Regions:
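Conserved, mostly hydrophobic/aromatic
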Residues: 33, 37, 63, 94, ...
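Active-site mouth loops of central-metabolism enzymes
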Residues: 10-24, 77-84, 164-174, 258-270
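N-terminal beta1-alpha1-beta2 module of alpha/beta enzyme domains
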Residues: 1-66, 71, 167
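Hydrophobic faces of well-ordered beta-strands that scaffold small-molecule active sites
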Residues: 7-11, 41-43, 72-74, 102-106, ...
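Internal, glycine-rich beta/alpha segment that forms the wall or movable "lid"
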Residues: 2-5, 83-185, 200-205, 211-212, ...
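N-terminal small/glycine-rich loop or linker at the start of catalytic domains
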Residues: 1-18, 110-114, 148-166, 237-263
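Alpha-helix-loop-beta-strand connector modules within alpha/beta enzyme cores
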Residues: 54-74, 129-136, 303-320
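Glycine-rich, proline-tolerant flexible connector loops at the mouths of alpha/beta enzymes
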Residues: 40-66, 78, 110, 193-197, ...
């Protein structure tokens, strides 16, 4: 018996351009996820992408309007490419309208250089922009009238009102600088493309940074985004590799079966639960799952199977 584990679901805000995109599925999936007991629904963020890709904060606002209690979150918002004061207003509004359900996941991306060019932000500035932005964002959320005269932000007397409910900030990343930033500035970590051993090592580095920042006694969430293919057949792993882990072909993942077994969830419900337990054993407290197969009908079949065969054991802590 383990403690109950929270599990969220990535909304179908993106998918291959050769498929017909059904925008209505974002709202209906959010409603369904709330009804079956997912802890949160999440949306990814890109402004230039090879696939269909709906904007994250707009999609989450739509999902919030269709639900009442489920958490809503960005996994992850590319804050460094956006104007900070606008993001503060957008996210504070969303947190208020959703009665405090927003979890703000933030990352620096970089896998699609064209979108940074389109945003007018040099790739090399991503980390520095985030380091400057986060303390300012916290102060605005707290109701302060903020003055800034930094390298990337220059404004005076900027505040958000009404003051929003608390907005937990989760940061993504696994590079050394990212882990240091997470320990210093975040309420939680959203890991991705990492093995259980890697998750444990990164968690230890984050804790060391939290210790240095005097934050070790504060609440801290350890989350992980995992792509899954729930399939009992022997061909499941091969199929998942053929689908490129659930990412566009343009993203060169050098995917092979051995790599996939380490970094994704593939197989029967028991296989997936056993793998999830390995992450729980090294400190993971919340999962965000996303089907590898993004074709709309397949996506729906996959999340329904996950909700029926995997989610109940996570929620009740009865994996072992």
């Amino acid at each position: 018996m383990t403690s109950p584990i929270k599990c969220g679901l990535m909304l179908p805000t993106h998918g291959p351009r050769e498929t017909v995109f059904d925008a209505s599925s974002i709202g209906s999936t959010a409603e369904w996820a709330e009804a079956v007991g997912f802890a949160a629904v999440w949306a990814g963020d890109h402004i230039v992408h090879p696939w269909h890709f709906m904007e994250a904060l707009t999609s989450l606002t739509f999902a919030a309007a269709r639900t009442r209690t489920i958490g809503i979150g960005s996994c992850v918002l590319l804050l460094p490419m956006r104007t900070l004061s606008i993001v503060a207003a957008q996210t504070a509004t969303l947190a208020t309208l959703s009665n405090g359900r927003l979890r703000l996941g933030i990352g620096i991306g970089g896998e699609w250089p064209k979108e940074w060019q389109a945003a007018g932000v040099p790739l090399k500035e991503r980390g520095a922009r985030l380091d400057e932005a986060l303390p300012l964002l916290r102060r605005m959320y707290a109701g302060e009238a903020v003055d800034a005269e930094g390298r990337f932000n220059s404004f005076s007397d900027v505040s958000v009102s009404p003051v929003p409910p608390p907005i937990p900030i989760y940061l993504a990343g696994k590079a050394e600088a990212a882990l240091e930033r997470i320990g210093r500035l975040a309420d939680g970590w959203l890991g991705f493309f990492v093995t259980p051993k890697g998750f444990q090592r990164s968690g230890a580095a984050i804790d060391a940074a939290r210790e240095r920042a005097g934050r070790i006694g504060q609440p801290f969430e350890r989350g992980l985004l995992l792509h899954f293919l729930l399939d009992d057949s022997r061909a499941a792993v091969t199929k998942a590799v053929d689908l490129n882990f659930g990412f566009p072909r343009e993203l060169k993942l050098a995917a092979n079966e051995e790599q996939l077994k380490k970094l994704a969830l593939v197989g029967s419900a028991d296989d997936i639960l056993a793998r999830l337990q390995q992450f729980i054993d090294v400190g993971c407290t919340t999962f965000c799952v996303s089907p590898i197969d993004k074709e709309p009908a397949a996506y729906r079949r996959q999340i329904e199977r996950f909700a029926a065969e995997v989610l109940p054991k996570l929620k009740t802590g009865t994996i072992k």
